[in-house]
């Protein structure tokens, strides 16, 4: 079994702007208590094309205009999808620039940052997906951890899921009395997918999704949808069909996700960076790409760096700049 290419290991070690310096943490305590086991070895290493594209020491940031449904009304908001590679310690599934083999696992991290207003108060939603770049499961980029944090004026909520074989570990910390703080296991049949990870997997960055065909099986809905519905986390039967379609005069790969009475249609670039161009959902959600940039964003935290936001479609105040193309060349 080939190990991850050396160049990607080197770059993962450099992406430390969001890390705290210091020694590696011990593999004990709440961070790894009860985590499901993960395969010792990958089935295949990350491909050379993926490694070349994601070894430039930068993150990919895409800004979107979003309409989301909350409290029965549509809200205008902004969404940023941030993709970056980084190393994790497989004993705890936390980022660690200093961890060495055999505990070091390179992942592609997606941070999905959603902001919108509900009347007098704002909502801030951050979903993080951590997916190894080497293939450990049937489907590439199977996640090892998914977390959601929601902040609004009533309070804040954390929801984490750690997928494994036959089960996923779940932790919820909520200001709601009926939810409180709890840990439990969620049954997940073999081959279960996670809706939050589809924003990585459907990009087909290292080979076709579902072998290039349609998919049917078990899926855990997005943590944000679970949060809004105040329902327990559970795997549901779902389908994903694919086709070629037209969007703004250009050909796209179109994926349609269906489960229960819910439908979500996602359009993806068929080549190049394979960006998520947008999606529409049966609950009225409507998301459109504005602009994409590759930046070492962790270095752009000084006064005056606010102007860099326009490079990925957001103005200084969080709005898309006038005339910004929705799907840039």
Task: Annotate each language-model stretch with its function.
Residues 162-212:
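Surface-exposed beta-loop interaction hotspot
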Residues 19-21:
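Bacterial signal peptide processing site
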Residues 25-169, 207-329:
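Acidic, serine/threonine-rich low-complexity disordered tracts
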Residues 15-17:
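C-terminal motif of bacterial Sec signal peptides marking the signal peptidase cleavage site
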Residues 1-8:
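Bacterial N-terminal signal peptides that target proteins for export
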Residues 11-12:
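Residue-level signal for mature regions of secreted extracellular proteins and peptides
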């Amino acid at each position: 079994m080939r190990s991850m290419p050396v160049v990607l290991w080197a770059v993962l070690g450099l992406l430390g702007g969001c890390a705290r310096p210091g020694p590696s943490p011990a593999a004990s305590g709440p961070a790894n208590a009860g985590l499901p086991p993960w395969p010792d070895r990958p089935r295949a290493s990350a491909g050379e094309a993926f490694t070349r594209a994601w070894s430039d020491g930068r993150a990919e940031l895409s800004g979107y205009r979003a309409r989301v449904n909350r409290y029965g009304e549509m809200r205008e908001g902004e969404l940023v999808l941030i993709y970056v590679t980084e190393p994790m310690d497989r004993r705890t599934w936390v980022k660690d620039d200093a961890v060495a083999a055999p505990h070091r696992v390179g992942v592609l991290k997606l941070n999905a940052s959603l902001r919108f207003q509900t009347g007098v108060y704002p909502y801030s939603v951050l979903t993080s997906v951590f997916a190894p770049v080497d293939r450990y499961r049937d489907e590439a980029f199977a996640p090892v951890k998914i977390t959601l944090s929601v902040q609004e004026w009533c309070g804040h909520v954390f929801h984490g899921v750690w997928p494994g074989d036959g089960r996923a570990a779940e932790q919820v910390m909520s200001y709601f009395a009926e939810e409180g703080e709890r840990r439990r296991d969620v049954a997940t049949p073999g081959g279960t997918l996670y809706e939050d990870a589809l924003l990585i997997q459907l990009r087909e960055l290292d080979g076709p999704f579902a072998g290039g065909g349609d998919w049917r099986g078990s899926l855990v809905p997005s943590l944000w949808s679970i949060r809004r519905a105040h329902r327990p986390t559970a795997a549901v039967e779902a389908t994903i069909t694919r086709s070629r379609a037209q969007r703004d005069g250009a050909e796209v790969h179109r994926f349609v996700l269906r489960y229960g009475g819910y439908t979500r249609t996602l359009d993806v670039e068929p080549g190049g960076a394979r960006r998520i161009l947008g999606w529409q959902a049966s609950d009225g959600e409507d998301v459109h790409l504005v602009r994409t940039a590759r930046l070492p964003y962790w270095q752009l935290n000084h006064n005056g760096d606010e102007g860099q936001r326009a490079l990925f479609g957001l103005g200084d105040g969080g709005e898309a700049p006038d005339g910004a193309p929705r799907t840039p060349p």
